[in-house]
């Protein structure tokens, strides 16, 4: 089990404090409608309607080498990519969901390509991961403050299993921490209302990350 040590923490944080300047990339299915990563929530789009972007997704011009090169030329020291945002769409080849880039026309593990490109430029590699997943059936729908179906009583939470969801989420975090080599920044997003801390199994999650990966820095958002 991971035990917090201030001296070790400060040492791990040195590069991040010194870096000061990095690139944070929000990119995914929501880039198609181009109305922001929260578009499904803001416009209360049903899953069935949002799926049209999944079937359309085929980013032929995706070139993380250009992103990484631009970051380096600008003097940046690290890059963070949204491996999965709140819509639940994975840019990586997760075995726990069908809602992923490898199942689209594109058929590629986009996180793998990104990681390779960033490392090739000598930059630190970061991945953003959403604790929230609006695609997963066990995540709270009706009455949740953020879910696209929060105002639709047809999406009652009666048969949703929160423990199943937490297990699923932890398993996906394990994947991104073990399948892509050293991850220098792991950025979790986010907590609200009663969805805080141990609701997500936070202690178990952090201990797992420390145990299975070479992750240097774990950052929650508020």
Regions found by a protein language model. Name each.
Residues 218-222:
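A short, hydrophobic C-terminal helix/tail in secreted or cell-surface proteins
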Residues 1-217:
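Mature catalytic domains of secreted/periplasmic carbohydrate-active enzymes
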